[in-house]
């Protein structure tokens, strides 16, 4: 089986770095939590902005953590690296004897670097194993979901997390195909989806596989779970004048985070069925 070569590692350019620096004001000094360290772009910007800032840098991707350690080596005495999930913030802060910090940042979703690593299986544009785990110490992969869930379960995942109107058609195609042979690569899955949802560049602005890949990635990594609790925990551990910044990419996480902010501000009743969002 031949997989495509991953995209070369380039200097990571953090998203909205100027806006984040203006909002979080690292020049105030003290502790910042970077809950999604990635390759360390935001953390590097914080550390360069102020010699008195320290960063608790969390990420569940061990490969990204290793690269970030190299990048941030000049600042090693001001960074604590943690392999973990930002949603476990309360526990992580206790472990490191921190009670309150002046700023917390999380940048949700998959990074461009992760998408460019064929062996991680996040992208339909690079052929690789159908993995999609952000934390490779976890056991469930996208291939396992694709090859074991029922047609109804697959359709629900693709519809709920990918907002894909053709979810049932795609799920049936997957189930029918896996009877013949397991679906193990990103290329296999992408082609199945494209056959289920005919693709014409004139009709579609995005590849038909986009929503299905997003849905499976969210399911594998349980990305939308406990985001509301994270917001509560984060605010509880901010100093009185502290700030929480959350960068969202797609509408599902955006709605959840905005609602959690409204609840914390007393603008909305927290007792709401998440499926109605």
Spans of model-derived segments:
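S-adenosyl-L-methionine-dependent methyltransferase catalytic core, i.e., the SAM/SAH-binding region
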Residues: 1-277
